[in-house]
Amino acid sequence: MAVRLIPTIWLFIVFAVIVSALPSLVSSRKLLEVKKQENLTVREEEKSHMPHVTKTSTLSALPKGKIPNSTPSKKGHAAVFAGKLRSRHLSTVDRYLRSVPSPGVGH
C-alpha cells in the first residue's frame, strides 16, 4: 500500500507546482492589457478609449475653479484670498455632510 502512495504523492506535488506557476485568470488579463499598451503608439494612445493613468490622476487631483495668488498684490492681501479659499472649501464640505433622512423612517 505504501509503495502505491509514493508515485501518487509525487504526481500531486508536480501538479501543484505546475498549477501554482501558471498565471491566474485575473493576472493573465492584466498581462494582455500591458502588452496592448506597449504596442500602442502615441497617436493611437490619444485615440484609445482608455484614459492614460497619469492624465486622469493629475486632473482629478487639481482643485476645481480659479485659485487666486497667495502673495500680496495691488488689489489686496493674501488673508482676503485665504478667506475666500476657506469659504469655498467649507461650502464643498457642507455639500457632502448634509444629512439625508433614512428611507425606512416615516415622514
From Swiss-Prot:
**Gene Ontology MF: a single term:** hormone activity
Write out the GO cellular component annotations: apoplast
Mind listing the UniProt keywords for this protein, alphabetically? Apoplast, Developmental protein, Glycoprotein, Hormone, Hydroxylation, Secreted, Signal
Record PTM text: The mature small signaling peptide is generated by proteolytic processing of the longer precursor.
UniProt function note: Extracellular signaling peptide that may regulate primary root growth rate and systemic nitrogen (N)-demand signaling.
Into which family does the record put it?
Belongs to the C-terminally encoded plant signaling peptide (CEP) family.
Name listed for the protein in its UniProt record: Precursor of CEP14
Q: Which gene encodes it?
A: CEP14
